[in-house]
């Protein structure tokens, strides 16, 4: 009986066709300002095919998204306070 070795992920970027809509997740990441760090994670995964070797890139992306979420939350709170002050 032979043992098969599990293959790593095949991480590839799809090429966007002109008539194809952009993926909502890609849109979200682009709007977040974290596209460069997300791309770094994708590049690392394509090169190493092992997420454990990409932890610095994953952490940088996580930090970027956390900062973006905090800024968004602050902006929403500020808008709610302004709306409440006008009433």
From Swiss-Prot:
Record's note on what induces expression: Up-regulated by estrogen.
Protein encoded by which gene: COA4
Disulfide pattern: 34-64, 44-54
Every CHCH domain range: 31-72
Motif Cx9C motif 1 mapped to chain: 34-44
Family: Belongs to the COA4 family.
Compositional bias segments (type: Polar residues): 1-13
Cellular component GO terms, alphabetical: mitochondrial intermembrane space; mitochondrion
Entry keyword set: Disulfide bond, Mitochondrion
Primary location recorded for the protein, binned into one broad class: mitochondrion
Functional summary from the UniProt entry: Putative COX assembly factor.
UniProt motif Cx9C motif 2: location: 54-64
Protein name: Cytochrome c oxidase assembly factor 4 homolog, mitochondrial
Intracellular or extracellular location(s): Mitochondrion
Amino acid composition bias (Basic and acidic residues), ranges on this chain: 69-81
Annotated region described as Disordered, given as residue ranges: 1-25, 68-87
GO term, biological process aspect, one: mitochondrial cytochrome c oxidase assembly
């Amino acid at each position: 009986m032979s043992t098969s070795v599990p293959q790593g992920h095949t991480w590839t970027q799809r090429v966007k066709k002109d008539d194809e809509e952009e993926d909502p997740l890609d849109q979200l990441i682009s709007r977040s300002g974290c596209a460069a760090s997300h791309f770094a994670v994708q590049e690392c995964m394509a090169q190493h095919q092992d997420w454990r070797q990409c932890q610095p890139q994953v952490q940088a992306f996580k930090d970027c998204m956390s900062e973006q979420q905090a800024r968004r939350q602050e902006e929403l709170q500020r808008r709610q306070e302004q709306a409440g002050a006008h009433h």
